[in-house]
């Protein structure tokens, strides 16, 4: 049998039986999707690959907990979202500590976000990164990863109505963040 014809459930059973090639196939099948989700959550940076690897390590270590109640892609995406949220928390803590150190040493804080980069993708990505994690996760899953409302609700363990309202709020916030950019380009 060719690897791409084997179902996810068959791969999981093979992994449980010690087949390392089945695990490699799961990684190959879902790595780009998982990295895209992580990148949408934390931005394009060196940590994306590290967190992506951690997703598959966590999956492997918890393989016996996977009951197949949701698709494997949903399960892996949930792990990716959780690890991304952990990274966001770590960054906020690091930033808070560095700001406290700067203030205690009497240094000046300068605004480094006022760059002159006209790359649309980067501008949009920066705007997405400004969203709070709860809005960003819904936006990334629905609009970037193209999950349905129901799939997004399952991944985030939220009611579908909450997904829809967060998506609407995320889009409003994103529009607010991007409005100055588009106004400057319309002139």
Regions found by a protein language model. Give the residues of each.
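Short, charged helix-capping/linker segments at alpha-helix termini
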Residues: 1-2, 16-25, 35-54, 160, ...
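C-terminal edge and immediately downstream basic/flexible tail or linker adjoining helix-turn-helix-like DNA-binding
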Residues: 2-5, 14, 43, 96-100, ...
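Internal acidic/polar
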Residues: 4-5, 94-121, 148
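Helix-turn-helix DNA-binding module
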Residues: 9, 129-137, 141-162, 173
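Sigma70-family region 2
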Residues: 16-17, 43-44, 56-71, 91
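Amphipathic, Lys/Arg- and hydrophobic-enriched alpha-helical face
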Residues: 27-45, 62, 128, 177-180
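Structural recognition of an alpha-helix C-terminal capping motif at a helix-to-coil junction
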Residues: 50-57, 70-82
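Arg/Lys-rich amphipathic alpha helix in sigma70-family domain 2
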Residues: 65-68, 78-99
């Amino acid at each position: 049998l060719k690897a791409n014809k084997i179902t996810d459930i068959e791969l999981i059973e093979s992994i449980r039986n010690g087949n390392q090639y089945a695990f490699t196939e799961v990684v190959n099948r879902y790595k780009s999707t998982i990295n895209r989700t992580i990148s949408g959550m934390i931005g394009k940076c060196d940590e994306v690959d590290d967190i992506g690897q951690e997703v598959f390590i966590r999956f492997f270590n918890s393989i016996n907990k996977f009951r197949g109640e949701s698709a494997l892609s949903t399960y892996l995406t949930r792990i990716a979202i959780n690890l991304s949220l952990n990274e966001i928390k770590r960054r906020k803590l690091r930033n808070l500590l560095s700001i406290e150190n700067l203030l205690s040493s009497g240094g000046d804080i300068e605004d480094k976000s006022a760059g002159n980069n006209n790359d649309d993708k980067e501008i949009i990505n920066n705007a997405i990164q400004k969203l709070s994690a709860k809005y960003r996760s819904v936006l990334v899953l629905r609009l970037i990863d193209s999950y349905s409302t129901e799939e997004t609700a399952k991944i985030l363990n939220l009611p579908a109505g909450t997904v829809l309202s967060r998506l609407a709020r995320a889009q409003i916030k994103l529009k607010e963040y991007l409005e100055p950019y588009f106004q400057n380009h319309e002139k």
